Amino acid sequence: YDNNGKLLLEYKADKPEIKPTPDPAKAAKQPKEIASIEQLFLTGLHLEQYRHATYDPMAYYMEALEREPGDIRCNNAVGLLNMRRGKFEEAEQYFHTAIKTLTERNPNPYDGEPYYNLGWSLKMQGKYDEAYSAYYKATWNAAWRDAGYFGVAQIDSIRKDWNAALEHVDLALIHNWHNHKARQLKASILRHSGETEKALKFIEESLTIDKFNLGCRFEKYFIGNNLTELQEMTS
């Protein structure tokens, strides 16, 4: 209980009974043995999530793309695998293919993820103008609005366009108030803009949400040059 008598934590023991043993995990079929593209995608996704030691999710996605080269989800999945492997140019092509299918009949897609991922791959190659456009297009979809605006704000910051960066990071925070990366970026933007008091106030607000926001704590050290802050982070 807290000081006001509110229940904070409660524990109830399970009844002493023997529960049925869960079914053992089934081995994945070989890609050629799987009939549908849907199941190929889901199998690849499952293998990624569980980081299987002997099965390669890429094989399942590539089998799906042999049957349907324009499949949106499998192109996006292959692109992401290539991103994690540092193959940014290869990833870009798969995201383009996913987007081509996604926008065949509707220029404003129902899912902004391939556009966001395309922006990420382009940014990692230093193609900032193209990345900027891709990130912006991702914001058409509400689910990717905060991530898209955050990507735009990052490129604004790379260009040292602090006014635009502040505008876009605020848009990211409107859609995800607890985006801790965006909070650190906003603190950095305010510092670069000479708004140190605003930056410190925003940092304190952010640390009330999450005391482990190390990006904001480092910004606080950077502004005040207070070694105590740095020591607390590294202790």
Model region roles, listed by residue range:
Residues 45-46, 80, 120, 154, ...:
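Residue-level recognition of tetratricopeptide repeat
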Residues 74, 107-109, 114, 148, ...:
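TPR alpha-solenoid repeat register
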Residues 67, 101-107, 141, 175, ...:
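Structural marker of alpha-solenoid helical repeat scaffolds
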Residues 48-49, 83, 116, 123, ...:
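Position-specific recognition of the canonical hydrophobic site in helix A of tetratricopeptide repeat
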Residues 1-35, 216-218:
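Long, contiguous interaction/recruitment modules in multidomain scaffold/adaptor proteins
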Residues 35-67:
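Alpha-helical segment of the N-proximal tetratricopeptide repeat
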